[in-house]
Amino acid sequence: RLAFNDAFAEQGLPWRWSRERYGVLLRTTGGKERLGAYIDSLDIGPERREALRARIPELHRCKTAHYTRRIRAGAVPLRPGVRRLVDEARAAGLRLAIASTTTLENIEALLATTLGADAPGWFAAIAAGDDAPRKKPAPDIYEIALSRLSLPPDAAVAFEDSALGVAAAKAAGLFTV
């Protein structure tokens, strides 16, 4: 949310997403899709809507740059228990993968900053935002990760942090925690 707000300010837009508004906007997965949903919710004419929609790629690039800076500054910690879970899975010799609708740049920055510079290499597959045409709750991102792992769904477990993510993992046939 803060990175979006930073991007809006940098791009000269008067928008500020509160925690409450962002909570509602999180029902739309994918940053570009979330921006589109927000623009579509505005009480504006079709010409202004199209002009704003045309700015989505640049707004998203700007948001990603702000978010990556926040990650590298240590402002975006891992959720409790994630480090232990990753360490235990690695110690057990399990293959790890990531299936996320965020950008690969954000994933790699978060891994390197929170787990160490070599952490991106711990994952046998990373499926990120633009890899999947349909975002969660569609199963696409999980299907891509499974394909890259050459695994059937019953040979993997998904750990999720959102209802849309759980729906996506289950739709892909994965046991989900």
Model-found features: residue ranges?
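Alpha-helix N-cap/helix-start and coil->helix boundary motif
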Residues: 1, 32, 83, 103-105, ...
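Active-site neighborhood of HAD-like aspartate-dependent phosphohydrolases
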Residues: 1-21
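Hydrophobic alpha-helical core bundles mediating ligand binding, dimerization, or RNAP-core interactions
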Residues: 3, 8, 31, 60-67, ...
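A metal-dependent, Asp-based hydrolase signature
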Residues: 14, 24-71, 80
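A short, structured active-site edge motif that brings together acidic residues
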Residues: 19-27, 50-55, 119-133
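Short beta->alpha linker loops
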Residues: 30, 54, 77-81, 102, ...
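Short, acidic loop-to-helix structural element flanking the phosphoryl-transfer center
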Residues: 53, 68-98, 108
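Substrate-recognition "cap/lid" segment bordering the active-site pocket of phosphatases
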Residues: 73, 97, 103-157, 163-174
